[in-house]
């Protein structure tokens, strides 16, 4: 496979979810052998998931998994995640839930405390490597 050059195209897949708002982004983009997942949030059927921090984290990771599936990829293909937590005190609980989805050979990861765009506790984006 060849490297993606500056003039090569990428392909976006899916429609922006979960909000009916017209947000200019693709949930997932394939660029060569790389798959880029836009920030996923804890929303199911248009509503923010309830049940506490662990439930939100699992919902986000389920959304990452479902979005990867759109391009024939899976969690084991993820090589990097970026995580935003509303409260750094949630870090231990986040790690426990995250480990359920990446039980061995977890991807590289950056985690930051941040005020998020909607009233949620966690958002995650991901980069996967899945050769064509």
What residue spans do the PLM features occupy?
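N-terminal presequence-like segments and the immediate start of the first folded domain
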Residues: 1-62, 66-79, 85-132
């Amino acid at each position: 496979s060849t490297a993606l050059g500056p003039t090569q195209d990428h392909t976006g897949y899916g429609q922006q979810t979960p909000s009916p708002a017209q947000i200019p982004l693709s949930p997932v983009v394939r660029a060569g052998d790389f798959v880029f997942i836009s920030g996923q949030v804890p929303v199911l059927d248009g509503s923010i998931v309830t049940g506490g921090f662990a439930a939100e984290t699992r919902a986000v990771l389920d959304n990452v998994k479902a979005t990867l599936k759109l391009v024939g990829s899976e969690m084991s293909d993820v090589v990097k995640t970026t995580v935003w937590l509303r409260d750094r005190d949630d870090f231990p609980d986040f790690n426990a839930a995250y480990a359920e989805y990446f039980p061995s050979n977890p991807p590289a990861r950056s985690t930051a405390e941040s005020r998020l765009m909607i009233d949620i506790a966690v958002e995650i984006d991901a980069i996967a490597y899945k050769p064509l």
